[in-house]
Every structure is written in structure tokens, then in C-alpha cells.
Curated annotation (Swiss-Prot):
Listed GO MF terms: ATP binding; thymidine kinase activity
Annotated organism of origin: Onion yellows phytoplasma (strain OY-M)
Catalytic residues in the record: 91 (proton acceptor)
Signal sequence extent: none
Protein name as it appears in the record: Thymidine kinase
Length: 209
């Protein structure tokens, strides 16, 4: 696709823990773009079937917008045509790293790209392609939720298994809502087998010194 002459592309990443309103923010952006008569395409990973298996993005508040289900990032490209002004992508943490090059390309073609995702997984590690998307974004909107323990701002997602903190060796991806996850602040986010008062080298780097 050749670069458009009108409009200016950009990448906005909306991130935060679960229950922070990320998807709701995407839906608001979509509605605003519709009011401006912009042509929009929305995508979400096929794996995200928490609230619907249909071709739609659904917020926790059950608000929806139509969406195309994709298995891999390159599935987006065949849908991009010259009249598209805005591309919306939900739950980007579940996508492969090709999404980084793809959204960079779309923005360079003067398409507005708005992405949401969890920047941290349940262990507090950078999640999937999200750190790279945050690095190349023109705008980052960091949302917070409310910690289920302290009632303070929450920027992490606590995984619970049978109501107790998960072990760090649990699978990274566990699709689900309140039955498995709740928002927590830094102080109250924990893993059953990790002592947070010690440096956890493997969480952030392969180097031990």
C-alpha cells in the first residue's frame, strides 16, 4: 500500500493491568473516529474468548465494536486498503512480535493505529511484544485499576489459582476474568514461590551480575 497524502499516522498504546478500562478506551477511540467519518478496522486475537467468540471486541462493561479475529499478526495485512484511516488492535500481548513491524508500517502509511494490551504478565515481566510496542509508540496511555487489597492504584495483574497466588512457573497465558485475576498494587502483587525482597534477576535479564 502506498503512503496516503492526507492525514498523519501515529501509534498509540493503551496499557495497564486487567480491569483498568483498556478495551473501553479502545471502544471510545473507535466511536470518536466514527463521528469523524473515518474508516476503521478493528482486530483481536482469536485466543481472547472471555466474553465472546464472535467477531467483536467486548469490554468488561459489555460494550462492543465489530472486530476481525486473527491468529497471527500478518493476518492483518490483507484487510488493509487505501481507504482505511484507523486500525484498532485489542489484547496485543497475545500476538507475535511481527505486530511491531506491522504497526510501524501502518503508521508510516498515515494510518492511525491504536493498540491495547497488558504490558506486564502475571509475574510482573514484560508481556509478549508490548515492551517493543511501547518503545515505538508516539503516545502511551497508562491506565490503572484499583488494588483488590489496599484500594490504592493498581498497575499489576494478580493471578489466583483456587483463590491463592499462583506459582511463577504457571503458563504465561491463561485467558479468563475475575475467576483467575484481580488488580493489585506493587506492594500486594505476589507470587507464591518468589521472595520480592530479593533481586529477581531472571525476571528482567539473562545476566546475573
Amino acid at each position: 500500500m502506498t503512503q496516503k497524502e492526507q492525514g498523519q499516522g501515529f501509534i498509540e498504546v493503551v496499557c495497564g493491568p486487567m480491569f483498568a478500562g483498556k478495551t473501553e478506551a479502545l471502544i471510545q477511540r473507535s466511536n470518536q473516529a466514527l463521528q469523524l467519518n473515518k474508516k476503521i478496522l478493528s482486530f483481536k486475537p482469536q485466543i481472547d474468548d472471555r466474553y465472546s467468540v464472535k467477531e467483536e471486541i467486548v469490554s468488561h462493561n459489555q460494550n462492543t465494536i465489530p472486530a476481525i479475529l486473527i491468529d497471527k499478526s500478518k493476518d492483518i495485512l490483507p484487510f488493509i486498503t487505501p481507504e482505511i484511516n484507523v486500525v484498532i488492535i485489542d489484547e496485543a500481548q497475545f500476538l507475535d512480535n511481527d505486530i511491531v513491524a506491522i504497526v510501524d508500517y501502518l503508521a508510516n502509511c498515515n494510518i492511525e493505529v491504536i493498540i491495547s494490551g497488558l504490558e506486564l504478565d502475571f509475574c510482573g515481566k514484560p508481556f509478549g511484544p508490548m515492551p517493543y510496542l511501547l518503545a515505538i509508540a508516539d503516545t502511551v496511555t497508562k491506565l490503572t485499576s484499583i488494588c483488590a487489597i489496599s484500594g490504592k492504584k493498581a498497575n499489576r495483574t494478580q493471578r489466583l489459582i483456587d483463590g491463592k497466588p499462583a506459582q511463577s512457573n504457571e503458563p504465561v497465558v491463561l485467558v479468563g476474568g475475575k475467576e483467575y485475576h484481580e488488580p493489585r498494587c506493587r506492594k500486594h502483587h505476589c507470587l507464591a514461590d518468589i521472595d520480592k525482597t530479593k533481586i529477581n534477576w531472571q525476571n528482567f535479564t539473562n545476566q546475573s551480575k
